[in-house]
């Protein structure tokens, strides 16, 4: 009986901690940096090329402008 009560209290405590962390995460304030390590991994895997770098698609370039004929990232939107 005592073990059951301890387990129930532990589960309730862990649930409350998760809800508090989720609320903090959703408002933009962050108390626990390790919880957002997945965001950091996503940003590191999505690198872009500076103007003059090579590209095959617009999202390869930081400015989102790719001259596909020359396969070069542009600094500004191309003039048509």
Swiss-Prot record:
Query: What Gene Ontology terms describe what this protein does at the molecular function level?
Result: ion channel inhibitor activity; toxin activity
Q: Disulfide connectivity?
A: 48-62, 55-66, 61-73
Q: Which residues form the propeptide?
A: 23-45
Signal sequence annotation? 1-22
Keyword Disulfide bond in annotation: yes
InterPro entries xref list: Conotoxin
Localization per Swiss-Prot or TrEMBL? Secreted
Any one GO CC term of the record = extracellular region
Q: Does tRNA processing show up as a keyword for this record?
A: no
Give tissue specificity per the record: Expressed by the venom duct.
Keywords associated with the record: Cleavage on pair of basic residues, Disulfide bond, Knottin, Neurotoxin, Secreted, Signal, Toxin
**Taxonomically, which superkingdom?**
Eukaryota
The record comments on the domains as follows: The presence of a 'disulfide through disulfide knot' structurally defines this protein as a knottin.
The Swiss-Prot or TrEMBL record describes its family as follows: Belongs to the conotoxin O1 superfamily.
Q: What does this protein do?
A: When injected intracranially in mice, induces a series of symptoms such as quivering, climbing, scratching, barrel rolling and paralysis of limbs. Unexpectedly, no effect is observed on ionic currents when tested on locust DUM neuron.
Give the protein's recorded name. Answer: Conotoxin Bt6.5
């Amino acid at each position: 009986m005592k073990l059951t009560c301890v387990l129930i209290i532990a589960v309730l405590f862990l649930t409350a901690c998760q809800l508090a962390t989720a609320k903090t995460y959703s408002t933009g304030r962050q108390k626990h940096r390790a919880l957002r390590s997945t965001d950091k991994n996503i940003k590191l895997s999505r690198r872009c090329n500076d103007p003059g770098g090579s590209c095959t698609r617009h999202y390869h370039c930081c400015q989102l402008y790719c001259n596909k004929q020359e396969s070069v990232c542009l600094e500004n939107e191309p003039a048509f």
